Every structure is written in structure tokens, then in C-alpha cells.
């Protein structure tokens, strides 16, 4: 096989709306360029530095054909490994290499993987509201668009301390009452089933806001309403408690968006403590490890529901789609509507049609990148308030 030599690796940060999106571009001597998602919304400049100061000199001049070898080199070259900054940087390069390989092959990426397992992947999006009526309106709007899987949230993840029994002069943060949240969530599921019956698949994200005993209690209370899945009912560092959650409830459990390395997901999968893996593909290092993770999951009956938030590039969204179209145990794809400017910077991104995302048709990942427009919307960073989650006594809690 003729070598395809890496000539340059660049990293771009653009903020077309409220998210800093990180994109890696790999240029080759064959005139083919590839793009990958490296978005770490909370630390974008750290990722850019790692790509341009460390990965670019490491990989320039090497053969882009050898994706597995290059991934292993990026992973171990710094000796310490598997953190979110490094994994996202590696992901950007890894996705770009797969993009290049499938372009040179003249086929969409999912075909390079081995072809499709399904005609289309079901999609879900988010409905929310401060009141049930507001939530119903949000759900109705998604049903009108053809969605039959909807993530529902009543209220949001924290606010000011006013209205809570909190100390004087409360520390700024996203204040959150766990008991109130649990009660409201059970009421929400009851109301949704009363209004929409059983044809609507309801998903819900706890966002790791509970203590283990509360997680067990909530799982038991939600069981009669048959959620499609409950996500992140516990934080990763408390995942051993999922065995006890399992013993008390058959509610399907999803977890993984915060995972960085195989030691975090291996035991949960082989011991069947979760039903859906929710890993963020760039957060675990890109397509190369995602394929390995997917095959491990299939052996133990765990289905795929890759994390797909608004703070990922359309390149990352398309990668999720290629994986989902190909992998037999893919279940569903999260989809967040994009701004018009985001679509101009990243033309060709996947869309939802009547609740489904269909196979991409262009060679490669299939999403373009307009550098000129991207540079017109530069990075803008501010500390994130929503990750400063506080309990009613002011204690910081996992966000």
C-alpha cells in the first residue's frame, strides 16, 4: 500500500453560539485532509496546546494509514495517559485519520467499518420545562417533528439558593435540593404517562446528583413508569453501588459520559450492571477505542447510546451516526439542534427526519469545515456555573 504521509496537524477553536468547539485537521501529501472532533468545552485551549505542541511534531512525517499504531503511540508517548485533555486531543487526530482513510477508499465511514446493520438509527432529543405545562409543550413540539424517544426534565439542574432552606449569605453556585428533585421527577413520570400513554419512550438524566441510597429509592419509584433508560443515576466514583440499584429495580440504567479509560467501564459491562453505555467518543480517545468498547458491550448484552450533547462538533455528531449505522448493538442517538452558523461552519452534518437519522452518503465522515467562518467566531471562555452544584447546606456536589 502506498504510504499516505502526514504533512501537518492543526487545531481550531470556534464559538458559533454558546459552545467552544474544537476541531483537528490532518493534512497529507496525497492532498486529502481529514477532520476530527476534539471538543472539551471546559478546557479548549489545553486541548489545542496538546495537539499543536505535542501531537503535531510526534506524528508529522508518519504514515496516516497506520491508525492503530498511531493511536497507541499518541496514547503512551507521554507515559501518563487517559485524561480528558489528552483523550480529546488524540480523538481529534484519530477521527481525522479515519476520515482520510475512508475518503481515499471512496466510501462513507460506516462502509469502511463493514457496512450497515440498520436502515436508520432512532434519535432522541431533550424536552424540559419549569412546570408540567411547559414540559408538555416542549414534548409536543418534538412529537410534531417525529420523535418517539424524548429525554424529559422537570426543572433544571440547580439555581439560586432563594426558596431553599439554606444558610445565610450562601456561596454562589447552582443550588439543588435532592429530595425535591426526586419528588418532582416521580410526579413528572406519572404525569407524562397519564398524558401520553405508553407509546412515548421517556428518557431521563439524573446527572449524578444523588447519594447512593437516594438512587436506589428513585429507581424503585420510577419502575412502574417504564423509562427507556435512566442516565447517570450515580457519579462514576460510586458506580460500585449500581449492583445494589440492580437488586432493587429493573429500570434500565445508562452511564458513561464521564468515562475516560477502560478501567471505568470494564467491570460495569462484564458484570452487566448497566444496560446502555453512554461514553463520549472524543472523551475516550476517538473512533479506534470506541469500536473496541462497542464489541466488548455486544458480548455482554450492553447497548450503545453514545453521548451527543450540544458541545460537540457536527463532525463528532456524524461519527456517532457512522458508528450507530454500522454497530449491531447501537440503540439510539442523542441529537441536539444546531445553530444556523454552526451548520455553515460545518456543512453536511446529520439531520433528523421523522425521528430517525439516516446513513451519511458522502465519502469519509462527510462533514466539511469552513476555516474562514470558524476564525470569525473565536474562542470565548468563562467559568461554568452549572458545574458548581451545591446542596442546601452549601456543600459542592458532583454536577
UniProtKB/Swiss-Prot annotation:
* InterPro entries (alphabetical): D-mannonate_dehydratase-like, DgoD-like, Enolase-like_C_sf, Enolase-like_N, Enolase_C-like, Mandelate_racemase_C, Mandelate_racemase_N_dom
Q: Which residues bind Mg(2+)?
A: 205, 231, 257
Question: What protein is this chain from?
Answer: D-galactonate dehydratase family member Ctu_1p00430
Q: What SMART domains does the annotation carry?
A: MR_MLE
* Family named by the database record: Belongs to the mandelate racemase/muconate lactonizing enzyme family. GalD subfamily.
Cited function: Has no detectable activity with D-mannonate and with a panel of 70 other acid sugars (in vitro), in spite of the conservation of the residues that are expected to be important for catalytic activity and cofactor binding. May have evolved a divergent function.
> What is a GO molecular function of this protein?
magnesium ion binding
Instruction: Cite the Pfam families for this sequence.
Output: MR_MLE_C (PF13378), MR_MLE_N (PF02746)
Organism source for this protein? Cronobacter turicensis (strain DSM 18703 / CCUG 55852 / LMG 23827 / z3032)
Question: Where along this sequence does the record place binding of D-arabinonate?
Answer: 207, 257, 278, 307, 334
Q: Which UniProt keywords apply?
A: Lyase, Magnesium, Metal-binding, Plasmid
Amino acid at each position: 500500500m502506498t504510504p499516505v504521509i502526514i504533512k501537518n496537524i492543526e487545531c481550531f477553536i470556534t464559538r458559533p453560539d454558546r459552545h467552544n468547539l474544537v476541531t483537528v485537521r490532518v493534512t497529507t501529501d496525497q492532498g486529502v485532509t481529514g477532520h476530527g472532533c476534539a471538543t472539551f468545552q471546559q478546557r479548549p485551549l489545553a486541548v489545542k496546546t496538546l495537539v499543536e505542541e505535542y501531537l503535531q511534531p510526534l506524528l508529522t512525517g508518519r504514515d496516516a494509514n497506520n491508525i492503530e499504531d498511531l493511536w497507541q503511540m499518541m496514547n503512551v508517548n507521554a507515559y501518563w495517559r487517559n485524561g480528558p485533555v489528552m483523550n480529546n486531543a488524540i480523538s481529534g487526530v484519530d477521527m481525522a485519520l479515519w476520515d482520510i482513510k475512508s475518503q481515499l477508499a471512496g466510501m462513507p465511514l460506516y462502509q469502511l467499518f463493514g457496512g450497515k446493520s440498520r436502515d436508520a438509527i432512532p434519535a432522541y432529543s431533550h424536552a424540559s420545562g419549569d412546570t408540567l405545562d411547559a414540559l408538555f409543550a416542549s414534548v409536543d413540539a418534538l412529537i410534531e417533528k417525529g420523535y418517539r424517544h424524548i429525554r424529559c426534565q422537570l426543572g433544571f439542574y440547580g439555581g439560586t439558593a432563594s426558596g431553599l432552606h439554606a444558610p445565610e449569605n450562601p456561596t454562589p453556585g447552582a443550588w439543588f435540593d435532592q429530595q425535591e428533585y426526586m419528588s418532582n421527577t416521580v410526579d413528572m413520570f406519572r404525569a407524562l404517562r397519564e398524558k401520553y400513554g405508553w407509546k412515548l419512550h421517556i428518557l431521563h438524566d439524573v446527572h449524578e446528583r444523588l447519594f447512593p441510597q437516594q438512587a436506589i429509592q428513585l429507581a424503585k419509584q420510577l419502575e412502574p413508569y417504564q423509562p427507556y433508560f435512566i442516565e447517570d443515576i450515580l457519579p462514576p466514583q460510586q458506580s460500585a453501588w449500581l449492583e445494589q440499584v440492580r437488586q432493587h429495580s429493573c429500570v434500565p440504567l445508562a452511564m458513561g459520559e464521564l468515562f475516560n479509560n477502560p478501567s471505568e467501564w470494564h467491570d460495569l459491562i462484564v458484570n452487566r450492571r448497566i444496560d446502555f453505555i453512554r461514553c463520549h467518543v472524543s472523551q475516550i480517545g476517538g473512533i479506534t477505542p470506541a469500536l473496541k468498547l462497542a464489541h466488548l458491550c455486544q458480548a455482554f448484552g450492553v447497548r450503545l447510546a453514545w453521548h451527543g450533547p450540544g458541545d460537540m462538533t457536527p463532525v463528532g455528531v456524524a461519527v456517532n451516526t457512522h458508528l450507530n449505522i454500522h454497530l449491531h448493538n447501537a440503540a439510539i442517538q442523542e441529537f441536539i439542534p444546531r445553530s444556523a452558523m454552526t451548520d455553515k461552519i460545518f456543512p453536511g452534518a446529520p439531520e433528523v427526519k421523522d425521528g430517525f437519522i439516516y446513513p451519511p452518503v458522502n465519502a469519509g465522515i462527510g462533514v466539511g469545515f469552513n476555516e474562514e467562518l470558524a476564525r470569525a467566531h473565536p474562542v470565548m471562555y468563562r467559568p461554568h456555573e452549572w458545574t458548581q452544584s451545591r446542596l442546601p447546606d452549601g456543600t459542592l456536589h458532583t454536577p
